[in-house]
Amino acid sequence: MANVALIGATGMVGSHILTSLLENPAVARVDTISRRTPSAAAAAPQTQLTTFVSDDTSRWAAQLSSLTPTPSIFISAFGTTRAAAGGFENQYKVEHGLNVEMARAARDAGTKVYVLISSGGANKASSFAYPRMKGEIEEDVKALGFERTVILRPGLISGQRQESRPAEAAFRFIAGIAGKVHSGLKDGWAQDADVIARAAVNAGLKALDGDVPPGSEKLWILGGSDIIKYGGKK
């Protein structure tokens, strides 16, 4: 049975990850750390889910370090937007800084498996700021040396966000129409949030058991087709 810590539990993918974790019989306990109380917390028993809620993110790493038992898996679906952060410089400080800080705290606490929701375009050498930031997060957490690191690189994420992102919403609408015509028209470039979430949970549990593809013993990267494969309903 796995103990799992999760940040980003109130976001579009993270909320589905939390639901998937709570429904999975292989997960004994879930600890979330967030700015707001996750919606799933109201129905979950305290023996299964513990939430730590604080706007002061400087307290998050200490909270993660204090968890007992130590999480065997740490999942990050944490992210923010340029608009919410007040510009890209602040977005980078929050998203890159907190992701790496929390990953380091998990590693130091003895967590074995780290799972990151990244982006399909992540590339530390990109000339564009957002994919470069995502690539730098990947590189910095890989350097921490977890027993196993799992990185998911979804394309466009389909689903309903709480915050407004007009351009992205237009593409999500197109993805929804394409998916209704035939799933193959969408799966290569867009994945549903709940599918990404199940893939993250299933891949994390498989990594904990050592059940990973050959050559992925230390680092397992899942692209769009892998996310569809591991995120399908059984």
Curated annotation (Swiss-Prot):
InterPro entries registered for this protein in UniProt: Epimerase_deHydtase, NAD(P)-bd_dom_sf
GO CC terms of this entry: mitochondrial outer membrane
Taxonomy, superkingdom: Eukaryota
Main location: mitochondrion
UniProt entry keywords in alphabetical sequence: Membrane, Mitochondrion, Mitochondrion outer membrane, Transit peptide
Compartment(s) where it occurs, according to its Swiss-Prot or TrEMBL record: Mitochondrion outer membrane
Keyword Cytoplasm: no
Topology in membrane: Peripheral membrane protein
GO biological process, one term: import into nucleus
Pfam family, one: Epimerase
Family designation: Belongs to the FMP52 family.
PANTHER family: OXIDOREDUCTASE HTATIP2 (PTHR14097:SF7)
Protein name listed in UniProt: Protein fmp52-1, mitochondrial
Organism encoding this protein: Neosartorya fischeri (strain ATCC 1020 / DSM 3700 / CBS 544.65 / FGSC A1164 / JCM 1740 / NRRL 181 / WB 181) (Aspergillus fischerianus)
Taxonomic lineage: Eukaryota, Fungi, Dikarya, Ascomycota, Pezizomycotina
